[in-house]
């Protein structure tokens, strides 16, 4: 491969950025609601469910995401002799990211829910348990946990680079390949700028949401 211009590098890296953005969006879209379900399991009065969920969260938070991605990708073959094609790489990335981040969001939800005072207003309004949760508790919980969620979301932007583990052509993988072929650091510099702008946009968006939800400001 001949020497590339900066514009050519940016064009190739933009394609990788699209994949990184896809990983980011899919992860949030599924891990946020899944995390709430897992939080309910973590707070369940059923000891078996509570124990299973605690073990799951402990494993997800106590082992590297990179390792989890490899288990999700290679697991079907090593455990069940199910052959998977290269198209499964991106799906394995989605699955690995979702189950990992859902565990973190579950603990954030749990701490937010358990910090809420229980039920006097709900009793006055005559709400049942489900109505109390969705109409009174959850909106307040979201306000309380948003800073913690923001931290995880910003971390997710950077973690998308771990998809290179499964040879997914996201931005970091492309930057690494270009840096090797072009024998210079410019692809990494461009990738760093992309990541910084992505994180800046996310931070501004989350700050805007936080202000919108702050009814008392």
Each predicted region: which residue ranges?
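Transmembrane alpha-helices and adjacent helix-loop boundaries
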Residues: 1-217
């Amino acid at each position: 491969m001949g020497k590339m211009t900066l514009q050519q590098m940016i064009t190739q890296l933009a394609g990788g950025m699209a994949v990184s953005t896809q990983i980011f969006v899919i992860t949030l879209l599924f891990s946020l609601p899944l995390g709430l379900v897992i939080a309910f399991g973590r707070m369940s009065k059923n000891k078996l469910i509570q124990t299973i969920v605690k073990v799951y969260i402990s494993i997800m938070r106590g082992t590297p995401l990179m390792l989890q991605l490899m288990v999700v990708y290679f697991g079907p073959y090593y455990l069940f002799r199910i052959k998977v094609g290269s198209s499964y790489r991106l799906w394995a990335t989605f699955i690995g990211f979702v189950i990992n981040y859902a565990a973190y969001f579950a603990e954030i939800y749990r701490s937010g829910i358990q910090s809420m005072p229980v039920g006097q207003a709900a009793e006055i309004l005559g709400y049942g348990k489900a109505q109390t949760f969705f109409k009174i508790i959850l909106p307040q919980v979201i306000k309380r946990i948003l800073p913690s969620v923001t931290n995880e979301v910003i971390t997710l932007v950077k973690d998308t680079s771990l998809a290179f583990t499964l040879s997914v052509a996201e931005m970091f993988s492309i930057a690494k390949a270009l840096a090797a072929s072009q024998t210079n650091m410019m692809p990494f510099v461009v990738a760093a700028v992309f990541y910084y702008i992505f994180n800046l946009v996310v931070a501004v968006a989350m700050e805007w949401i936080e202000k919108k939800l702050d009814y008392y400001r």
